Every structure is written in structure tokens, then in C-alpha cells.
Amino acid sequence: KNYLPEDQDIPRMQSLYGTNLIEKDHIQICFALAKVFKDLGQIKKSFDFLKEGNACQKRLLNYEISQDQKLFSRIRQAARHIQENTLKVSKKSSLPTPIFILGMPRSGTTLIEQIISSHTQVAGAGELEDIHFHGASLSIGDKKCSEKAIKEFRHIYLEKISKISQGSPYVTDKMPQNFLSIALICSAFPEAKIVHTKRLPAATCWSNFKEYFPNGLNYSFSLDDIIHYYSLYEDLMMFWNQYYKERIYHLNYESL
């Protein structure tokens, strides 16, 4: 919805902002008013509401960038053990082949999936949480990596996308933060395609800040944290490129 000056929702939201709301509701009103004043061309006012909403959410989460710095370090440490257990799979299979579209959140994965899944042989699955849900313990080294563990992970994931595929030989998974699990993806799915979407850093970071992510992207509520996280992401992608250069197709959003 684009707001106009005469929109009756605006005074209602402004009156709500001035009341004693619980913090979660106050945060949502801040983001809503940021959108209102952006549409009205009052950019400074919009930014002030964005800053307030993001700062409140960061306080609620008690997040520090050091949490993600440790996470990225553990991912690198676990990668070697995962790589040592890369599966060999038959090229002849009735199961669909995954196409992973990944990168920073807000980097264009949705558009890329729309383009790829418009092909008659591709089914679009959207953002699946299965790589994280079933594989995070392997990716960060919490669970001992073995060929058996990776086979079990592969089986669970392929069973899931088989139900979505509707007979299509390829299925896209556009969960952006699957970039954290590239070692596991390459070891469990040697046949998989990986598309890394990259957008201009300033556009990506700003888009993370202005969108309200209530779940999962704890770094996104501070511009400083976003910039640090973006640097961690770039370093990790360079690390993956050293080992999986032939597996990752890099696509610039601005080139589309």
C-alpha cells in the first residue's frame, strides 16, 4: 500500500505511537510509520522511525555481532570434515535435482527464482528451512560429521523436495542464508546447482535495515551490525570459492 496525505490510517497510527504499547507493538508501529513518511516524501522523519524501531528490536534480542563472528568461525572449522565425507551419487535417479539460490538476504533471490522456475522443468519451492533445520548441527560442527550422517541428511531433504516437485526434474530452494551451508550442500548433493546472487553492498545493507525481520536476522537491526555481517558474508563466500569454485555460479542482480 502507498500512503497519501489524506489516508485515514495515518492519524490512527500516529495516535497509537503515542500510547503505552508493549515493545513488540511499538516496534511494528515504528516500521509502519517509517513506510508512511517514506511514501509522503518525508525522508528524515521516515529514517528516524526506522532507527527507533530497529534500536528497540535490537534491545529485545540482546544481540551482539560477536555471536555471528563465532558462528562463521565454527562453519569454517567444520567445513574440512564435511568435505572429507563428500558423497558419490548415481547420475540416474528419479529424485529431483536441487537448485540452491543463495546469498545475502534482500540480494535478489526471489527474482532469480521467478526467472529460473518459469522453465517447464523447474518447480519453485520458495524459502525452505530444511537445510538449516536438518543440517545446521553438521554445518557448525555440533554433530559429528560422517558419510552416514550426510546420507541421512540428503535423504530427508530429497524426500521433502520430491513432494514439492510435482514431477519436475529440478526444484529451486531460495533460502538466502543457505550460503552458510555450502560445504554441506556440496558434499550431500554433488549433482546440485548453486546460484549465488550478489547485489550492490549499499543497496543490500540498506534493504536489510529498512525491512522488519521479526525472526532470524538478528544482525539486521543496526547499520553497524549489518555492515559487519556483510563483511563476514563476503569473507565466507571467498572461502567457499577456494574449494567449490566450479560448483558456484555467481550472478549480479544489477546485470539482470
Where are these regions (language model features)?
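Alpha-helical solenoid repeat scaffolds of the TPR/TPR-like class and their adjacent stem/linker regions
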Residues: K1-I164
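PAPS-dependent sulfotransferase catalytic domain
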Residues: V122-A125, E129-C145, S165-L256
